[in-house]
Amino acid sequence: MAALGVAEAVAAPHPAEGAETAEAVELSRALSRLLPGLEADSKPGRRRALEALRRALEEPGPAADPTAFQGPWARLLLPRLLRCLSDPAEGCRALAVHLLDLGLRRAARPRDALPRLLPALAARLAGPVPARRPPEACEELRLALVQLLGLAVDLCGAALAPHLDDALRALRCSLLDPFAAVRRESCSCAAALAQATPDHFHMQSESLIGPLMQTISHQHWKVRVAAIEATGAVIHFGNGKSVDDVLSHFAQRLFDDVPQVRRAVASVVGGWLLCLRDRYSFFHKLIPLLLSSLNDEVPEVRQLAASLWEDVGLQWQKENEEDLKDKLDFAPPTPPHYPPHERRPVLGCRELVFRNLSKILPALCHDITDWVVGTRVKSAQLLPVLLLHAEDHATQHLEVVLRTLFQACTDEEAAVVQSCTRSAELVGTFVSPEVFLKLILSTLKKTPSASGLLVLASAMRGCPREALQPHLAAIATELAQAHICQASENDLYLERLLLCVQALVSVCHEDCGVASLQLLDVLLTIVALAGATGLRDKAQETMDSLAMVEGVSSCQDLYRKHIGPLLERVTASHLDWTAHSPELLQFSVIVAQSGPALGEALPHVVPTLRACLQPSQDPQMRLKLFSILSTVLLRATDTINSQGQFPSYLETVTKDILAPNLQWHAGRTAAAIRTAAVSCLWALTSSEVLSAEQIRDVQETLMPQVLTTLEEDSKMTRLISCRIINTFLKTSGGMTDPEKLIRIYPELLKRLDDVSNDVRMAAASTLVTWLQCVKGANAKSYYQSSVQYLYRELLVHLDDPERAIQDAILEVLKEGSGLFPDLLVRETEAVIHKHRSATYCEQLLQHVQAVPATQ
């Protein structure tokens, strides 16, 4: 029956074809001998027939003429090959697809095959239920079928329009195929189909958007690229409303790890901005996508995006030339303060951004605070690009921009903060400082924050000097207010505050002289409150920079210039200070760092110290102040006594400051304060600032309190007290009242039993000085009983286990031997036999015999 059908087909040509040529008849007869094998029951038989057909079509011969091939192809081969697409044998189906490919390529009118080819392809690729697997089980064959569909699109072009339903049904399924190569080929086919049938495709293009958006996130990057490019063509030649459906997916691909994918997004979006029919209505949605690519990490992507964006701007500029006539004819030059290393966008690009900024900003500002890090980073990178285009037109959106920057500058991601500081710099560059300062400073006045200070610093850094200079004093005054500069002791806050001062100094240079006091006040606060050493060092460097722009040699010269007003402000509340008061910390910094200028400010400094160091004040505060006072007293000539005026305040220091704090009170804190006071007294007496007479005055006032401190638990206090007494005795010589002099040595003798050898050695040294004072006294006989008692006690210690102590005691005894040598000899001989070693006693006796008695 099959042979009969073939014979009838050969004998009765189609009426539309007319009489066949001899080549066609010959080909028909050749094929008629092979076609019956396609109906064989056995798989090998059908396969042999298909192989024979393949050889017949591939070999040169009658089939080489497309016109001669068209008739037999359409009547004999096509129907049977399409039936073979459902053959149970995979090999037969593969050969059938290959033969269909050959036939389409050789046929003179391949479009004639579409009415039968497209439904057959759709049946094999789609099936009746889209959710189920396609009828064609072999993925390589599905790939071949999609390639065949693509070939039909290439060969037939617009002739596919009547068969779009079948083609789209096949593509909707193949775009979701499990096999990556099928998806990729389907994307190419969809793009080609859209381009081939633009007049009809737009009515059904939306049906492909869903499958394409599922494919756009495929794990293979080449599939993702193909899906993006296919989406570009489908929307370009289809329904532009689908842009809304793909925007979020395209935005997500901007985060793709593969640069080729990001490049595809830039290319497609740029193409839409140039060629999409209703592109004007989508500008505000597409511009952010393309501009985001300007910050891509790969140079090639950045260059492509920049080139496309410039083309978009120039095209729009040309299309709206009449509207832009004035701006084109009278275009102002590039602003002189335009950011360096930035190329100014063409007018069309700037106008596009400006006109769409009100629609772009709300979504962008929302995304900058998104919970996803990548979204925040990308959005923050886009904002400075928009501001660079908007220039001074950003003024009308400034409130929204600044509010966003305040929030975004608190981000933990450094990249977000970096982009936001760049945005703030551009605000300073293009917006009048009168406008942005009003908004920023009012916000800081209500709620001071580290992020607000960072925005202010960045804006000032971007502002031209001549624009910022009139506002310099107002800014510095506001920063110096306690509600801002003392709002937080957090190092980040203080670092941002420092950035504000650095910005003013770096931008305004010598103009900072009008606000030098306020800026120094802020820097002083930063140094006082900073917890990190590095931050204090930076603040110190900024002080040096401020001094340089003011034309003075160092920050100490700055202090000399402003120390009066600084101390007047800081000490205004000194009666209310505690250990944690910012003013106390500021006062401490001024005293410690002002150097010689401190000597000019004693009328402020000493009364403040007197009031704050009373026993009724906060103990921790007193400890801090004593520490600072000790430090400056050690360098008194270069600090507190630089003008030689400190001795005139000596009575206040000794009677009103040191004496009350040397009094004994119970508790560890009180003991620590006594130690601090003793240290301060030691610094005072050893500073070489006081004359001998002044030291004697100090001795007269404080010796009783110092003697009591020899009993302190603190080894350091006992040691320093010994040294102070030694200094007092050396200065007074024999001028000390005998009664007072006699009261000293018993306290020193007690220290020879101290647990600390250092204290014992210091006590021994002081006893040497005491004996020298006795030598210098007029009535030595008055001291005989005291000296005799001293001899006895010293001879006990001469047998000490510690050799160093023995040596020290021997020196004391030698020093005192000249007073009453006979008495000393008797006392020595009385105990020599009790000593573990008579060596030291013998040395002492030899010394007494060799040295004459003191007259």
UniProtKB/Swiss-Prot annotation:
Pfam families: HEAT, HEAT_DAAF5. HEAT repeats lie at residues 71-109, 202-240, 241-278, 280-318, 354-376, 377-414, 599-638, 696-734, 738-776, 784-822. Keywords: Acetylation, Ciliopathy, Cilium biogenesis/degradation, Cytoplasm, Disease variant, Kartagener syndrome, Primary ciliary dyskinesia, Repeat. GO terms for molecular function: dynein intermediate chain binding. GO terms for biological process: cilium movement; inner dynein arm assembly; outer dynein arm assembly. Cytoplasmic protein involved in the delivery of the dynein machinery to the motile cilium. It is required for the assembly of the axonemal dynein inner and outer arms, two structures attached to the peripheral outer doublet A microtubule of the axoneme, that play a crucial role in cilium motility. It is linked to Ciliary dyskinesia, primary, 18: A disorder characterized by abnormalities of motile cilia. Respiratory infections leading to chronic inflammation and bronchiectasis are recurrent, due to defects in the respiratory cilia; reduced fertility is often observed in male patients due to abnormalities of sperm tails. Half of the patients exhibit randomization of left-right body asymmetry and situs inversus, due to dysfunction of monocilia at the embryonic node. Primary ciliary dyskinesia associated with situs inversus is referred to as Kartagener syndrome. Interacts with DNAI2; probably involved in outer arm dynein assembly. This is Dynein axonemal assembly factor 5. It comes from Homo sapiens. The gene is DNAAF5.
